[in-house]
Amino acid sequence: MASSNTQETERAAAPANADEQQPEKPLLLPEASGIVVFEGEGVTIDASHTDQGYVMIRCEPSEKRLKARIATDAQTYYYDLPGGEQYSVYPLQMGDGLYTVRVMEQVENDLYALRYGAEIQVKLAAETLPFLYPNQYVWYDENTRAVGQADELASGAKSDREIARALYRFVVTHMSYDTDKAATVPNGYLPDADASLASGKGICFDYAELLAVMLRAQGIPAQVVIGNVMPENVYHAWNRVFLEGEWVWMDPTFDRSGHRESDYITDRIY
């Protein structure tokens, strides 16, 4: 996973009639600027921009599997951590407070040992910021085709709600559910927005990630939510989108299936 060295990438100049349209917003990208760094045992944790809702981690290559463990008193998240020189980006989606960030190395099977860790006090500049930047689960940069596609679809829209509606309808109509992939998807699978865009096929995780990429690229906070849908008790991925001061539930996979928001039980948010 590549990371950008620039925090904001400016878009093309707004058209002459921009006063009638939604103003252009910068593309927010993560930066490992080296201002606040924790290092040890071959691990580097860059916490320079925790106020923006993310932390960046890299680790020297290891023959053993590596995990990033990011926790508060409220919840714990585990992520795969590729070894190498490039940073991986992880969200600080649990809000303000003390985070424990650890890199864990596999001992055997599901047993992991601490390789290095740090405690980081987080104060977000805005509570929606973790859902405006790319991270390991919702990855993109200025060269991602889905970002350009979102720009085209958002052209002429007069509000975030209009943009969200256009992007949602695009994902719903462009994507078809891949039952073969659903039956064989490996543990630890991560979506690829451009692969989903190119194939027009995917599982619920692909739908939700593609929509989140396109929305975040337009400066609209978007979550990928993973949990269960009742009454079927189906493990599923969907979205929540921040519009007009509140989080709005969206499910591009099920679309008009008859489910209500109250049917959805959240496990994890990215």
Which ranges hold each PLM region?
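Intrinsically disordered, low-complexity segments enriched in polar/charged residues with Gly/Pro
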Residues: 55-57, 182, 226-228
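N-terminal accessory/pre-domain segments preceding catalytic cores
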Residues: 1-158
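Hydrophobic/aromatic-rich core segments of domains that either
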Residues: 206-270
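Secondary-structure boundary elements
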Residues: 134-199, 210-212, 249, 258, ...
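Generic preference for flexible, low-structure residues
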Residues: 73-75, 115-119, 183, 187, ...
